[in-house]
Amino acid sequence: MTGMFFFASLFSSFESLFFRLFFVCSFFFPLLYSFIFATLHAFVFLFSHTLVSSQFRRLKLPYHHHHTFTIEAFFYWFFFFFFFFSHCRRFHIAIFIHPYDSNVVPFFCFFFYFSLFSFFSFLFTSLHFNFFFRLCRHKHLLDIPDQTTLSSLLHRHTRLPRDVRRKHTCFHTSVWCDMSSYCIAWRS
């Protein structure tokens, strides 16, 4: 009887440990994804900002969209830390006190905020991408016919000069990062 009680308590402790590990992994892996994508997004945008601004300075053209890249990188980091610290205390209660506690609700709120934030970040990145494309076409920086679309331009990388190819690769990478983070948040 004592052995059965021992194995039952051992199984119960393992079950509790499993659920706690599950909630810990479910909480920290999305944070890790968010951290990686925020860092990569910031570096890509700063690199794109350097390339674009240097090109505009070389051509002596006004560039009023100058600070949006830095603002977007700050926007990414601000929301990442805001969501982390605003939910960290309640997540601590949900993970370490009782795995079946009703405080698990913030877990789903986090994914809602994260997916919403990723969607808007993807939207802003697309707007930057379209702005750069339209501005280049309007200022005749590239030999682009008026009927050319953005997607057709992206499929013609080999026909573009090297510096322009690098710019569009940077923007395309940032869009991919945002879309990947949005898909991860959506599937989670």
From Swiss-Prot:
Q: Transmembrane residues, as ranges?
A: 27-47, 68-88, 104-124
Q: Which UniProt keywords apply?
A: Membrane, Transmembrane, Transmembrane helix
UniProt membrane topology term: Multi-pass membrane protein
Q: What is this protein called?
A: Putative uncharacterized membrane protein PB15E9.02c
Which organism is this entry from? Schizosaccharomyces pombe (strain 972 / ATCC 24843)
Q: Where is this gene product found?
A: Membrane
Please tell me one Gene Ontology term that the record gives under cellular component.
membrane
